[in-house]
Amino acid sequence: MSENVVVIYSGGMDSFTVLHKALRAGKKVHALSFDYGQRHKKELDYAAAVCTSLGVPHKIVDISAINTLIGGSALTSDIDVPEGHYEEPSMKQTVVPNRNMILLSLAVGYAVSLDANEVYYGAHSGDHAIYPDCRPEFVHKMNDVCGIANYTPVTIMTPYIKDSKTAILTDGLSMGLDYGQTWTCYNGREKACGKCGACEERLEAFKDNGATDPLEYE
């Protein structure tokens, strides 16, 4: 079995931890990032910098043209990013329709071309309330499809799907990871806003771990 794996790497905390987890498991990681027109495109700069420092092969694929088909999200359209807790109903405005199915389909195709048997992404339990394409049942169904869609079966791996962001951070800190190398904020400004749901969940995870977030906030 090939040790090549594909990691969908946004540049955020969760995929950053998944990337390192796969590397420490001895996998030959190929990182894959997507420009889907997100306003927080700054995360891609963080992803590129980390992959360069680690010597990990990294592709950034521009699929921003899909926004002519699937607009209407605060992450991609001219809609204010909601503030408040990550699990509040208002955060549904940040859902990009069918995003993870699209990204995973592309990642699986890339995996097949690499003779890789696994694709990793950083879904976690905090995503379940708002993002249907981060729930276990979605991953199970995608794996059913990925097992028959190509001559080479590919398994979607979600090592943190039952864990909170707090637990992910706990694991990452135990590995000595530097989360100053990650970007979480949904706003694409120079500094993180500290008020959007993504920032609030990140700050909560650091507080729960008794740690200081190295990122600068407004």
From Swiss-Prot:
Pfam families: QueC. Keywords: ATP-binding, Ligase, Metal-binding, Nucleotide-binding, Queuosine biosynthesis, Zinc. It catalyses: 7-carboxy-7-deazaguanine + NH4(+) + ATP = 7-cyano-7-deazaguanine + ADP + phosphate + H2O + H(+). SUPFAM superfamilies: Adenine nucleotide alpha hydrolases-like. It is an enzyme of class 6 (ligase). Zn(2+) binds at residues 185, 193, 196, 199. Its cofactor is Zn(2+). Pathway: Purine metabolism; 7-cyano-7-deazaguanine biosynthesis. The keyword Zinc applies. GO terms for molecular function: ATP binding; ligase activity, forming carbon-nitrogen bonds; zinc ion binding. The keyword Zinc applies. Binds 1 zinc ion per subunit. It comes from the Bacteria. ATP binds at residues 9-19. One of its GO terms (biological process) is queuosine biosynthetic process. Its EC number is 6.3.4.20. InterPro entries: QueC (IPR018317), Rossmann-like_a/b/a_fold (IPR014729). Catalyzes the ATP-dependent conversion of 7-carboxy-7-deazaguanine (CDG) to 7-cyano-7-deazaguanine (preQ(0)). Belongs to the QueC family. This is 7-cyano-7-deazaguanine synthase.
